Amino acid sequence: MIVKRLFRTMAPVAKHFDYLVIGGGSGGVASSRRAASYGAKTLLIEGKALGGTCVNVGCVPKKVMWYASDLATRLTHAHEYGLAQNVPLSKESITFNWPEFKKKRDAYIHRLNGIYENNLKKEGVEVVFGWAKFNKDGNVEVTKHDNTTEVYSADRILVATGGKPVYPEKVPGFELGTDSDGFFRLEEQPKKVVVVGAGYIGIELAGVFHGLGSDSHLVIRGKTVLRKFDEIIQNTVTDYYVEEGINVHKETNVDKVEKDEKTGKLSVHLTNGQVLEDVDELIWTMGRRSLLGIGLENVGVKLNDKEQIITDEYQNTNVPNIYSLGDVSGRVELTPVAIAAGRKLSNRLFGPEQYRNDKLDYTNVPSVVFSHPEAGSIGLTEDEAIKQYGKDNIKVYTSKFTAMYYAMLEHKSPTRYKIICEGPNEKVVGLHIVGDSSAEILQGFGVAIKMGATKADFDNCVAIHPTSAEELVTMR
């Protein structure tokens, strides 16, 4: 018998569903579509635009901006490849039409929103736009965009509300800055920008701004960026950003922010005493927190000390027939992870018997950073491998070289690879790469590592020449 005790009807209910999904991001959309494909009567509720962070203010528009920035850099290489112009292109001579490009980018995202909605409808998912909240009856009350209210009940409910950016609210003047969401609302390219944060979001945005010609400043608390990644990635990206001319302010933080009301410019005061003057935009990229405020207390769903929904390996919360996944539950916060978890959850809940124990394996999840150059990682860092297996039980292979593309160029971009192996069979437990096309390279090697590949398996693969990736199967 399915949760009639929990979802009792004590308020007028518009409709009852087999499955109700709160949040139309990557995980919610994937789970609702999969459930509907099995015949479940499914409702998806979204407060803003379909696709969530990834499609609207994350992966997709960010990658579009990265392409523009990367192309701007490569255009300056043209004359070194024999492509003559009257005036050789340089970062100073290239102009980027930010407002016009923003229109094209936003139109592309709008098309994707429509594709998401059409795909949901094709699968038979009902979509309601509005803000959902559990009421004290255990049902879901939705305030729609026209300010009308509907109440829905369901046998099973998924919470996939995602996350939102964190602000340093104790810093005087913090509100003068924006966040990574606000980056996509900028109508003009800032001449001078300060990005605060050493995580992948800050690194990507600082790189984009620099590539497009902005005077870019990056403020980090430690000595390196990307501190959750292996040291080969931390050191290579940090050093190259400095070499490229990004102003990396290390071992400091923002003390206060002031605004000149006449010019609109900001003064960003750092804790090391330095003041960054005439700043056009300040962007906080200090992490994200779960997007809550949906009445979880009314149904008793428990949170951890980071205010993330606690789930087990099957995405179950502590309340029967309420589930959670994606950023709001604090697991691996990546779009493909949420999609995979959402599909597996619906397989288990609504699919055939063979999927009754379906769950996502959160180990060996590949991730990339669209820095300049790109970085990719899967498995354990070297420090993690030492802690897990002991230093004497691991072997580390590294390679440092210049990709062929840069052989014709005076200014070289680094390529660094590291393979971490464990035990006498040298099972590959970690792979960390920095260099052009790292994201594309890592996808294939991710399959191999997920299957338990050893160093011998890598060695037995015939190399593709000439490529950078061949180094991974010829490394000694």
Swiss-Prot record:
The EC number(s) given in the record are 1.8.1.7
Q: Where does NADP(+) bind?
A: 198, 201, 204, 221, 227, 287, 333, 368
| GO BP terms in the entry | cell redox homeostasis; cellular response to oxidative stress; glutathione metabolic process
Requisite cofactors: FAD
Q: Which positions form S-S bridges?
A: 54-59
Q: Which reaction does it catalyse?
A: 2 glutathione + NADP(+) = glutathione disulfide + NADPH + H(+)
Q: Where in the cell? A: Cytoplasm; Mitochondrion
Main location per the UniProt record: cytoplasm
Q: How is the cofactor bound?
A: Binds 1 FAD per subunit.
Q: Does the keyword rRNA processing apply?
A: no
- Answer yes or no on keyword Flavoprotein: yes
Gene Ontology annotations for the cellular component aspect, listed alphabetically: cytosol; fungal biofilm matrix; mitochondrion; nucleus; peroxisome
* InterPro entries with a match to the protein in the record: FAD/NAD-bd_sf, FAD/NAD-binding_dom, FAD/NAD-linked_Rdtase_dimer_sf, Glutathione_Rdtase_euk/bac, GSHR/TRXR-like, Pyr_nuc-diS_OxRdtase, Pyr_nucl-diS_OxRdtase_dimer, Pyr_OxRdtase_I_AS
Q: Name one GO molecular function term.
A: glutathione-disulfide reductase (NADPH) activity
- Residues that, per the record, bind FAD: 26-27, 46, 53-54, 62, 132, 327, 335, 465
Q: What does this protein do?
A: Catalyzes the reduction of glutathione disulfide (GSSG) to reduced glutathione (GSH). Constitutes the major mechanism to maintain a high GSH:GSSG ratio in the cytosol.
Q: What else is on record for this protein? A: The active site is a redox-active disulfide bond.
Instruction: List, alphabetically, the PANTHER family matched.
Output: GLUTATHIONE REDUCTASE
Complex formation: Homodimer.
Please report which protein family the annotation says this sequence is part of.
Belongs to the class-I pyridine nucleotide-disulfide oxidoreductase family.
What name does UniProt use for this protein? Glutathione reductase
**Organism listed in the record:** Candida glabrata (strain ATCC 2001 / BCRC 20586 / JCM 3761 / NBRC 0622 / NRRL Y-65 / CBS 138)
Name of the coding gene: GLR1
